[in-house]
């Protein structure tokens, strides 16, 4: 047998950008470690500087960064972090981007438009990333944009476990805010024990971002507690209008459940006054005090991320984390 055999052990390292350091700390805590010390700041002209304060040579490094407000700044910071790790001889670099930046720009709606999600995936690869990890991509097909493994995690188990404590499945309905996400709603219905399905028919003008018109409900929601599910809440317009349509159609009450709480612009006002009994999101993105309101519940995503990171580090199966959900992992 040729070659050299060493007794060195693999070392798992978690590093964090400045967008949501609390999430990285929670992930590290779940893994029984600490976030690697680093220095990061912006120069007067806006350029970003990053340096890691410990050696990462030969390490399996997971770079955690959220991409909410200032998405371009945080994306650039994460790219610079990956570049620094590559030049410092990290053995493997996994980008952990729970809310993948530019995920909604995954195809061309009109001529002369970019496919920005593909561009971002290419940038990660060029910077030196070996692997990506995200939660609830806008479309699963985006995994094909990256030349390497992309672990697509699902927050559904986290959300469903909580929603079970908030509704009677025997008198509930799972509702998609549009026809395009009916498959997600179907998985929710199965997890809740086969509750009825419905969706809100809506139209959208692709030339006017963040605007849609909710028209009518397709399905039986009268007298039922409706669970309105989506991947994200941005300005809240789609969700607020859907809640109103459901209540006007005779729903007993409405609970909103979404993975990513972007909560841009008028979202807080819209969601707090739309009539929803509760709005549930995870902390894939930081939600400051100014964006919190009485009906909002924020669930931790760190345990799920930590389990996936441990599976990757141990060369295990990430897909097995979702065997009971009926979705394809990585």
Model-derived regions: residue spans:
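PRPP-associated nucleotide enzymes
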Residues: 1-330
């Amino acid at each position: 047998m040729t070659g050299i055999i060493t007794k060195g052990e693999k070392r798992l390292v978690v590093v964090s950008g400045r967008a949501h350091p609390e999430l990285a700390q929670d992930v590290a805590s779940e893994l029984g470690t600490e976030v690697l010390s680093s220095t990061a700041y912006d120069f007067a002209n806006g350029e970003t500087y990053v340096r890691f304060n410990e050696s990462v040579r030969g390490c399996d490094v997971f770079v955690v960064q959220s991409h909410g407000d200032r998405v371009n700044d945080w994306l650039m910071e994460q790219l610079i972090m990956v570049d620094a790790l590559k030049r410092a001889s990290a053995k493997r670099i996994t980008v952990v981007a729970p809310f993948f930046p530019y995920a909604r720009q995954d195809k061309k709606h009109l001529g002369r438009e970019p496919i920005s999600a593909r561009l971002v995936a290419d940038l990660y690869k060029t910077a030196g990333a070996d692997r990506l990890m995200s939660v609830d991509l806008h479309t699963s097909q985006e995994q094909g944009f990256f030349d390497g493994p992309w672990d697509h995690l699902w927050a559904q188990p986290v959300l469903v476990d909580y929603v079970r404590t908030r509704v009677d499945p025997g008198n509930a309905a799972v509702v998609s805010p549009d026809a395009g996400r009916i498959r997600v709603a179907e998985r929710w219905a199965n997890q809740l024990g086969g509750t009825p399905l419905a969706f809100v028919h809506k139209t959208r003008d692709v030339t006017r971002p963040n605007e849609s018109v909710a028209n009518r409900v397709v399905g039986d929601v009268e007298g039922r507690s409706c669970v309105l599910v989506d991947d994200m809440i941005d300005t809240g317009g789609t969700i607020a209008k859907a809640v109103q349509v459901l209540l006007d159609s005779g729903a007993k009450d409405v609970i909103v459940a979404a993975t990513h709480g972007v909560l841009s612009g008028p979202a807080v006002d819209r969601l707090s006054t739309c009539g929803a009994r509760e709005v549930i999101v995870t902390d894939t993105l930081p939600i400051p005090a100014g964006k919190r309101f009485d009906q909002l519940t924020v669930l931790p995503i760190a345990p799920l991320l930590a389990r996936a990171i441990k599976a990757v580090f141990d060369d295990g199966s990430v897909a097995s984390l979702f065997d009971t959900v009926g979705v394809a992992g990585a």
